[in-house]
Amino acid sequence: MFSKQVTDSKVYQWFNDRLEIQAISDDITSKYVPPHVNIFYCLGGITLVCFLVQFATGFAMTFYYKPTVTEAFSSVQYIMNEVNFGWLIRSIHRWSASMMVLMMILHVFRVYLTGGFKKPRELTWMTGVILAVITVSFGVTGYSLPWDQVGYWAVKIVSGVPAAIPVVGDQMVELLRGGQSVGQATLTRFYSLHTFVFPWLIAVFMLAHFLMIRKQGISGPL
């Protein structure tokens, strides 16, 4: 993985004595890749790349976005029209969001069709399903943040869906909205979920997902 010139350098030796870089490098480069693996096995990795793009562009927009019902829409317009390359950052965020959902769906189909969910990879499949739910939840919460007509009514419809659940439905609706109706508390909740709760959740389950894949390897052909 590293050239002889690099491994012989004093800087490399200093880090290797403390972090065992060479052992980590050997473990990565010696991992067996089955011969049946093709481009469709890259869909999960592409989904990860889309998430990283989402994280970077979303973080950039938090410097200008204002999560209030009176300023949310105008702050998005400011990002699009006044911030240097703001239109590009937001557009990339939107495009990569759509791409992430698409790649996630294709990845789920690939795993299912190739039997990658079978023993001993049941837990890997379960964490993947959880990641899929979080990904869709990202889309739902992010869709509302511009707080335009589309976002507002999307929130109103989505947050009203749990009302059909017996016994606890009305309580769930009130929890999502932060009250009886859609308003500032609703936007605050969705913003918090989108920028803090879901990123942490997806990072934790991604780590678990990748560690299990690393431990068990790629499933064999059907």
From Swiss-Prot:
CDD domains: Cytochrome_b_N. InterPro entries: Cyt_b/b6_N, Cyt_B6_PetB, Cytb/b6-like_sf, Cytochrome_b_N_euk/bac, Di-haem_cyt_TM. Binds 2 heme b groups non-covalently with two histidine residues as axial ligands. Binds one heme group covalently by a single cysteine link with no axial amino acid ligand. This heme was named heme ci. Its main location: membrane. Heme b 2 binds at H93, H194. The chain crosses the membrane at residues 39-59, 97-117, 123-143, 193-213. Keywords: Electron transport, Heme, Iron, Membrane, Metal-binding, Photosynthesis, Thylakoid, Transmembrane, Transmembrane helix, Transport. GO terms for molecular function: electron transporter, transferring electrons within cytochrome b6/f complex of photosystem II activity; metal ion binding; oxidoreductase activity. GO terms for cellular component: plasma membrane-derived thylakoid membrane. Its cofactor is heme b; heme c. It is a multi-pass membrane protein. The keyword RNA-binding does not apply. Heme b 1 binds at H107, H209. GO terms for biological process: photosynthesis; respiratory electron transport chain. Heme c binds at C42. It holds the Pfam family Cytochrome_B. Gene3D superfamilies: Cytochrome Bc1 Complex, Chain C (1.20.810.10). It is found in: Cellular thylakoid membrane. Belongs to the cytochrome b family. PetB subfamily. Heme 1 (or BH or b566) is high-potential and absorbs at about 566 nm, and heme 2 (or BL or b562) is low-potential and absorbs at about 562 nm. The 4 large subunits of the cytochrome b6-f complex are cytochrome b6, subunit IV (17 kDa polypeptide, PetD), cytochrome f and the Rieske protein, while the 4 small subunits are PetG, PetL, PetM and PetN. The complex functions as a dimer. Component of the cytochrome b6-f complex, which mediates electron transfer between photosystem II (PSII) and photosystem I (PSI), cyclic electron flow around PSI, and state transitions. This is Cytochrome b6. It comes from Crocosphaera subtropica (strain ATCC 51142 / BH68).
